């Protein structure tokens, strides 16, 4: 249900790069001299989707975890039913309905040859009649049509909504062909954005030594380096853009350029993307545990040298520019700590694509012991052997190359949640050139985890030990297993969790939603195995809470472009949701009724004219993602 050169970093591994790296797309190089305060790049507005202004809430190329955002999103002020106008003369190439992803989506083929995509619609206007006809002919809720209906520029095409994923908004996408998409802003689409991009932080590293600098210090012209007067440094910048106040929706940037004195050493302009290269997002935007907080960490694949002055220039899609000038120093005045984790309780996590170990927790009463591959104790007090601060796990393996486990313990008063902890982190030392891994780890309490990983990206420059880790984390509702470093786009990750005391199904954790999803394909029994193309947190979950339906109620929704009565029924579940719209069947007196499933906020929607009279019954059968069939009988309320 979810979906990179590959990710440039492992814990201590960096890919080779050119000294001068330029990746300019449509607009190309904006000049070889050091940046001025402004540049002339204001594409005249030639198309506004609505009959009124609307601000951006998501920009082109934004980080979507395992892919880039292929279009732009407009706010509709949490309202549905805004008429959307045709950008040019053309025909409706295709319309589709689905409870997920794009929801109700229209593909409009313009005379220019471009395909304009309008997603999350509430209504296709007059084309709703064709949709309804196909649904009732096939008894399927999710359908696809190719109407080929002509429209002229400025005609009302469709109506905004909230189908698929997200609150009410319009997703606009422009496809040049089957592989390439272009930013609508480049084509003259309205892109209202009144705030220049923000640089929240920077990071400089060499091998397993990392230094992070806050925005306050960077604004004063200083960036902290972890090593003094040494070459072979690497740089990442945490950046976000906002379109307006309040700053609710962090967005991506269009252009990022870096100069060393007056030499441009890096340039990235994002005006086009390729579907075939969408996973390159892991290449440019480094994975961190706080991946859903404001800003992305942009990796700069250019060698950073000491004793040099650097200029950074960042531009958004409306032409607003932010510039910073800095030099490298061992310390910076005004530097503040940077948040590296979110929703994280275990001492091991991923930051900038590296596996990190939080030895700062020693100060709270945690104890760490390192054991070797022959179960020998390498140190029973890592808190005394190493500085009590956050470090890369690779740095620990540098001192203890035969380490196999790091055991950590803490009393109930030390953990902060009133529960004592006694767990261990299984660690694996991988060479920078090792592309495949077979690794078996015993995490105690009868749990063994086996991983077979193929197609790991190869680090070409850095020979520092590369650290991988897995540990168990306890929460109030369940225990799950964390795998690090995240953000690796692999050929295949096969993971098996063996626990004779828990033979429940295997689930994976959504990166930003924090929801659990069952693996579609997995083995059964005490050894549960599943596959993915990147590391995920997983859990063995026995779902004993069946899906239920809330009280039905009448509301209004847009049908054929007009607000009309609909019956809405809340859907309640903890783990196993609805796989697709066709997993739902509704009947009244044995007569099939079309159902729309709104995945946010989890409601079934039935057209009012198709619902029987008040007091009569509707039978609804839902197949959930775990293949459980749920049957409900509801009574139609008074309108």
Name these PLM-found stretches.
Residues 16-116, 144-147, 152-153, 162-170, ...:
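Surface-exposed, glycine-biased beta-strand/turn segments
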Residues 227-229, 245-252, 356-369, 486-489, ...:
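A short beta-turn/strand-edge loop motif at beta-sheet boundaries
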């Amino acid at each position: 249900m979810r979906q990179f050169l590959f990710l440039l970093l492992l814990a201590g591994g960096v890919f080779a790069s050119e000294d001068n790296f330029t990746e300019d797309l449509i607009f190309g190089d904006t000049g070889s001299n050091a940046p001025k305060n402004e540049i002339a790049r204001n594409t005249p507005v030639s198309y506004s989707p609505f009959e009124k202004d609307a601000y951006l809430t998501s920009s082109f190329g934004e980080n979507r975890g395992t892919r880039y955002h292929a279009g732009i999103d407009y706010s509709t002020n949490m309202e549905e039913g805004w008429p959307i106008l045709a950008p040019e003369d053309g025909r409706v190439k295709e319309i589709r309905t689905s409870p997920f992803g794009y929801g109700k989506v229209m593909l409009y083929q313009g005379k220019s040859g471009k395909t304009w995509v309008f997603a999350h619609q509430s209504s296709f206007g007059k084309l709703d009649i064709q949709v309804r006809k196909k649904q009732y002919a096939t008894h399927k809720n999710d359908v696809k049509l190719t109407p080929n209906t002509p429209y002229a520029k400025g005609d009302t095409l469709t109506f905004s909504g909230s189908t698929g994923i997200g609150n009410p908004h319009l997703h606009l996408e422009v496809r040049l062909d089957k592989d390439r998409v272009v930013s609508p802003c480049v084509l003259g689409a309205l892109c209202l954005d009144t705030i220049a991009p923000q640089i929240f932080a920077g990071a400089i590293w060499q091998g397993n030594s990392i230094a992070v600098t806050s925005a306050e210090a960077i604004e004063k012209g200083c960036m902290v380096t972890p090593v003094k007067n040494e070459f072979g440094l690497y740089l990442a910048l945490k950046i976000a853009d906002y379109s307006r106040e309040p700053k609710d929706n962090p967005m991506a940037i269009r252009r990022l350029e870096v100069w060393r004195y007056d030499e441009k050493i890096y340039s990235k302009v994002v005006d086009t993307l390729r579907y075939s290269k969408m996973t390159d997002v892991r290449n440019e935007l480094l994975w961190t545990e706080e991946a859903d907080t404001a800003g992305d960490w942009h990796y700069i694949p250019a060698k950073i040298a000491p004793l040099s002055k650097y200029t950074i220039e960042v531009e958004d899609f409306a032409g607003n520019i932010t510039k910073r000038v800095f030099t490298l120093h061992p310390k910076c005045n005004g530097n503040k700590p940077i948040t590296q984790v979110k929703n994280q309780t275990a001492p091991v996590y991923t930051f900038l694509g590296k596996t990190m170990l939080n030895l700062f927790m020693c100060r709270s009463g945690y104890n760490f012991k390192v054991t070797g591959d022959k179960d020998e104790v390498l140190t029973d007090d890592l808190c005394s052997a190493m500085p009590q601060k956050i470090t890369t796990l690779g740095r620990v393996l540098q001192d203890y190359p035969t380490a196999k486990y790091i055991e950590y313990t803490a009393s109930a008063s030390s953990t902060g949640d009133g529960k004592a902890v006694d767990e261990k982190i299984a660690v694996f030392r991988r060479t920078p050139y090792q592309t495949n891994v077979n690794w078996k780890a015993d995490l105690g309490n009868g749990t063994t985890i086996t991983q077979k990983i193929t197609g790991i990206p190869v680090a070409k420059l850095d020979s520092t030990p590369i650290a991988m880790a897995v540990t168990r984390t306890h929460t109030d509702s369940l225990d799950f297993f964390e795998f690090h470093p995240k953000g690796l786009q692999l050929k295949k990750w096969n993971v098996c969790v063996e626990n004779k005391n828990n033979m429940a199904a295997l689930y994976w954790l959504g990166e930003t939603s924090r929801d659990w999803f069952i693996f579609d394909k997995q083995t059964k029994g005490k050894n549960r195995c599943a596959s993915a193309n990147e590391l995920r947190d997983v859990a063995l979950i026995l779902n004993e809470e069946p899906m239920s339906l809330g009280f039905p109620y009448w509301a209004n929704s847009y049908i054929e472009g007009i607000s009309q009565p609909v019956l809405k029924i809340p859907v309640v579940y903890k783990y196993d949701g609805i796989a697709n719209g066709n997993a739902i069947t509704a009947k009244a007196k044995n007569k099939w009724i079309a159902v729309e499933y709104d995945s946010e906020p989890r409601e079934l929607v039935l057209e009012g004219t198709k619902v029987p009279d008040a007091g009569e019954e509707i039978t609804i059968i839902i197949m959930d993602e775990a293949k459980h069939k749920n049957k409900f009988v509801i009574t139609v309320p008074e309108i």
